[in-house]
């Protein structure tokens, strides 16, 4: 428990939390809403350079958090956990946020780069978990879907451990308005006609509060570029149609060279409908999908340290490019 003293007296809670933070076991807890809340609260208390706001709510009323640090000009947007089983991406982003905050506050180097100097001129915004309902369902089962629990139970045939969609059975990364009609036709051809654990794109683009919230935010706020983190495959997707900026290829090459990940093109049922696709198509600015790690979703917590080490330099470059 953290005890806070009266105004004007020593803030003993910070001392306790600093001792805790030095030894945070990023792989030693359940990565659900409660665990994520504990990490975010700790980060914001320890690091005054990190500000937090609730960007909006999911279908089930769970908070979708936004973390900001650095100068407010020309920010980069980093988003994770679009899919229920891909919660490791949210932990990766929180861990990198802690690194960025330390770099800004203490001058610490990240991959031998003084990222703090850059953050004093430009900013970063992080949405660790775009799909909090999906994450909760994949970890705790259909009961976590609230009023949608019967839908989830039926669509998952009683086993929601491989749930990727939101609580309404809509795959958020098929719900953005970029090639949505063509993707919807492909879904129909594959027999995907209704809410499902994955790959059902909804009745129309931005039908879901989570995808609509993210689009509204990007329409209201200028971002230099955006990165959407998924798992798995160790791949970087960087283009979408005629509006892909010329510099996107070079940026992807830099990220690939620094991480060892390969530049790829998506398969048919992963073409269009995604956040990266919409960002490029609608805003005409660079956006990337980063498929972290390798294996079978959900990737284990024990993979996080190696994934973070592999991607650290790439993450730094993604912020400063």
Regions found by a protein language model. Give the residues of each.
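Glycine-rich N-terminal segment of FAD-binding domains in flavoprotein oxidoreductases
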Residues: 80
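A residue-level signal for conserved active-site and pocket-lining positions in enzyme catalytic cores
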Residues: 61, 172, 290
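Conserved beta-strand elements of the Class I
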Residues: 75-77, 288
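Short beta-strand-to-loop junctions in surface cap/lid or active-site-entrance loops
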Residues: 66-73
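C-terminal accessory segments enriched in acidic
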Residues: 1-5, 10-34, 39-42, 46-51, ...
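N-terminal cap/lid segment of alpha/beta-hydrolase-fold proteins
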Residues: 54-59
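Active-site/substrate-binding loop(s) of hydrolase catalytic cores
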Residues: 73, 87-88, 93-246, 253, ...
